[in-house]
Amino acid sequence: MLLAPGDVIKRSSEELKQRQIQINLVDWAESEGGKEDKTEPKEESKAEGSKDGEGTQSESGQKEEGGKETKDADVDRRIHTAVGSGSSTKGLGERANENADRGDGKVGGGGGDADAGVGATGTNGRRWVVLTEEIARAIESKYGTKIDVYRDEVPAQIIEVERSLQKELGISREGVAEQTERLRDLRRKEKNGTHAKAVERGGRKQRKKTHGDAQREGVEEEKTSEEPARIGITIEGVMSQKKLLSMIGGVERKMAPIGARESAVMLVSNSIKDVMRATAYFTAPTGDPHWKEVAREASKKKNILAYTSTGGDAKTEFLHLIDHL
């Protein structure tokens, strides 16, 4: 039996059901007016409810509980769809498409549609790259597509993995910080004019075309449109898995869920009543106000296995632990 924070269990409820693992979740509700939190047991299975000796809730209590669950589910959805900073396409040395929608797969500068065949190669025949080794490994592991890491080469087309996709890929806090630092370095170079000459050359060519004949104008226009794209750097922020796959190719590798018979875990709980029979506990940053007390009591028990989140997505780490216990 495994103890874990209530919000981690709640986020993982669907995957736990697929694994045929029972859930005993003690929910919590914050009362208005600064009153003390009140705790109500939520019984995920009749068998566990009877074991813990918890009584059947009244009809009004069930309605309140249902409303709380709906609210929590809405909050969860908002968290998972949160937009990180710098959510639009950024151009270094070339102008990005200002009207590009975040999810349509269009790449600024080249005008290409990723869904229409840009794939892993991107616009102008160049391949997409990422900013850290951890992100490259996560993409290859999840989608089976090998992607290179940016090595300060110019030109380049860079994928910035944003907040919601970071969680989907299970990127650690250290990995997120490393990507942020590399982005800052690139923007610092842009500010210092590292790529300014490339843009300036393109601008001069564009002005010349007004004085040439029609044939020369066409040639100059073609060269001008290609010059910034060839010399500059494009950074494309990506929030969704769908857009990422349209850019790099590949498909998500879906592993068959591990059933209860293949996992040592039969029950997960955040109830302090289950501490005595728990064999392991998993702790992570949580909004469960009662988890601190549960974890403290569990740590006093002899011969109990303790696991702690490494700073990545708590749900991903929790399910990984269950599958390997």
From Swiss-Prot:
Transmembrane segments: none annotated. Residues 106-122 have a biased composition (Gly residues). Keywords: ATP-binding, Capsid protein, Hydrolase, Inner capsid protein, Nucleotide-binding, Virion. Residues 1-122, 185-230 are annotated as: Disordered. GO terms for molecular function: ATP binding; hydrolase activity; structural molecule activity. It holds the Pfam family Orbi_VP6. ATP binds at residue 106. It catalyses: ATP + H2O = ADP + phosphate + H(+). InterPro entries: Orbi_VP6. It is found in: Virion. Its main location: virion. The keyword Transcription regulation does not apply. Residues 8-18, 32-54, 61-79, 92-105, 185-203, 211-229 have a biased composition (Basic and acidic residues). Its EC number is 3.6.4.13. One of its GO terms (cellular component) is viral inner capsid. Homohexamer. ATP dependent RNA helicase essential for RNA packaging and viral transcription. Possesses ss- and dsRNA-binding capacity. Belongs to the orbivirus VP6 family. This is Helicase VP6-A. It comes from Bluetongue virus 17 (isolate USA).
